């Protein structure tokens, strides 16, 4: 993984993240980027722009 220094188990200089649904090419995806599409009665889950995690909103559409 080019975003992760295997020797230190930390992200490489200039990288924000190494993995996650909201991580793309070592950077956090923009706020509002759909990271988990709507399913059934649930709305899309979107990235915050501040984390590599895809938060579950748990809001009905």
Curated annotation (Swiss-Prot):
Pfam name, any one: Disintegrin
Molecular function in Gene Ontology: toxin activity
Keywords: Cell adhesion impairing toxin, Disulfide bond, Hemostasis impairing toxin, Platelet aggregation inhibiting toxin, Secreted, Toxin
A cellular-component GO term for this protein: extracellular region
Domain Disintegrin span(s) in chain numbering: 1-61
Motif Cell attachment site location, chain numbering: 39-41
Lineage: superkingdom: Eukaryota
Family matches, as InterPro entries: Disintegrin_CS, Disintegrin_dom, Disintegrin_dom_sf
Tissue: Expressed by the venom gland.
Localisation per UniProt entry: Secreted
Secreted in keyword set: yes
Disulfide bonds: 3-26, 9-23, 17-23, 22-47, 35-54
Misc: The disintegrin belongs to the medium disintegrin subfamily.
Subunit structure: Monomer (disintegrin).
Protein family: Belongs to the venom metalloproteinase (M12B) family. P-II subfamily. P-IIa sub-subfamily.
Function: Inhibits fibrinogen interaction with platelets. Acts by binding to alpha-IIb/beta-3 (ITGA2B/ITGB3) on the platelet surface and inhibits aggregation induced by ADP, thrombin, platelet-activating factor and collagen.
Name this protein carries in UniProt: Disintegrin atroxatin
